[in-house]
Amino acid sequence: LWQAPAHSEGQGMSEVRAGDAFAVYGLLRAGESGFAQFGLEQAFAPLGPCLLTGRLYDLGAYPGLVEGEGQVVGEIFEVRDPSVMPRVDAFEDYWPQDPARSRYERRKVRLIEPDRDAWVYVWVLGVEGARLIESGDWFKR
């Protein structure tokens, strides 16, 4: 069951604001290449582990979260500096002005734990041939 946010703000087209929660599950997790590349230790304040609803697929060099039943392990942060988001969107191949080019979409979803809304990147292309990560944890693939 894909959990919709408590209040929808047009899904991926809304602006990320300072104070918003952001959940990550792959290369943007602490210790991974994307986290360091964008200086997220300054832009994002860590809030701890989180669980998201969905399925996680190994897409080669990175994972993709797709809608569906299951749990995905991630980390939740509070956004301190939203000016980093256009660069992070580009890294995630999310183009808000040109969705047809996008591999991911940034959406606000309801987390399983903690029980709150958070932004997350959701894979929007097919997963044919990709391996399901049964544990739901990119670090335990």
Regions found by a protein language model. Give the residues of each.
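Glycine-aromatic micro-motifs
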Residues: 2-5, 9, 13-141
